[in-house]
């Protein structure tokens, strides 16, 4: 099959910031990143182990229990919240659900450590099962994930189902900020293409005059659709079996005659991995789709194939 153009173009969206929290901790997450996509996850049930606290002058250690459907293990974490403080002078309280460790000073001040961020920030690793993917980008970019999730009916249903079906796990939210990049592929080996040299130049000029370098609704639409089609989360209905599709709300990339889309996640930034019942994601192995059927359009990444 001949390549359509000598110069082919694709969209690459990659995660530039990611956060993971419990639903009732959303208000504590930094709102500085512009989160565009959220995932509702099942994660191992984490709890502080009561009675495990060992307090020394210069440090503290505490145990965390990590429970899944198939395993139950613990991890001891040693930490110091300030090298000059005598840690014996503080009061330490683990709450009833064993999700928070409160550190109180003599004057009543202090801090609260939630088990999930505490575990991840101190070398813990979590596999996160994706059960739903959604976007938090409104028509004019006005809606954020925090507003969207406050009264999210699907989140409420997942939490309700989870109480009865998966008591060995917790529900968490992964928030993703994405950054776009233009991919370009030139084939200088072959001499014959479906389109002429002038058509190739016209196509290149059209794309370079409208590069996908700004976040907009269509960019988030196509990123969300690609993620849903790849992972096929349990609670998603749309895009599971009909992506890509020229009739969906990302027609911009068809109008510019893009060849492909790549979506890249980096959950390792927060010591996590992501998977669904359908697929496990591997870091540095991006999700790749051609926007046209293989029998009609050669992939821009297929340089050496016939």
Residues covered by each model-derived region:
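Boundary/linker segments flanking structured domains
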Residues: 1-306
């Amino acid at each position: 099959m001949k390549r359509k153009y000598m110069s082919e173009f694709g969209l690459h969206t990659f995660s530039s910031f990611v956060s993971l929290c419990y639903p009732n901790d959303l208000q504590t997450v930094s709102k500085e990143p512009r989160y565009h996509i959220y995932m509702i996850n099942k994660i191992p049930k984490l709890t502080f182990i009561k009675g495990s606290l060992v307090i020394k002058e210069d440090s503290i250690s505490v145990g965390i229990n990590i429970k899944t459907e198939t395993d139950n293990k613990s991890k001891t974490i040693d930490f110091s919240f300030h090298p000059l403080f005598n840690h014996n002078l503080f009061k330490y309280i683990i709450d009833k659900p064993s999700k928070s460790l409160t550190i109180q000073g003599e004057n009543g001040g202090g801090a609260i450590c939630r088990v999930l961020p505490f575990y991840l920030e101190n070398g813990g690793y979590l596999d996160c099962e994706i059960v739903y993917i959604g976007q938090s980008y409104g028509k004019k970019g006005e809606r954020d994930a925090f507003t969207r999730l406050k009264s999210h009916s699907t989140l409420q249903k997942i939490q309700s189902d989870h109480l009865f079906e998966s008591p060995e796990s917790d529900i968490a939210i992964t928030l993703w900020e994405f950054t776009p990049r233009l991919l370009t592929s030139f084939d200088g080996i072959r001499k014959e293409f479906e389109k002429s040299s002038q058509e190739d130049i016209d196509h290149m000029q059209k794309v370079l005059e409208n590069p996908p370098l700004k976040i907009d609704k269509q960019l988030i639409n196509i990123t969300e659709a690609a993620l849903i089609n790849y992972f096929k989360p349990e609670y998603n209905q749309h895009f599971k079996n009909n992506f890509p599709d020229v009739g969906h709300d990302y027609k911009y990339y068809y109008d510019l005659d893009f060849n492909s889309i790549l979506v890249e996640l980096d959950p390792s930034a927060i010591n996590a991995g992501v998977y669904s019942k359908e697929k496990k994601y591997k870091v540095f192995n991006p999700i790749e789709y051609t926007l046209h059927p293989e029998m009609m359009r050669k992939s821009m990444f297929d340089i050496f194939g016939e």
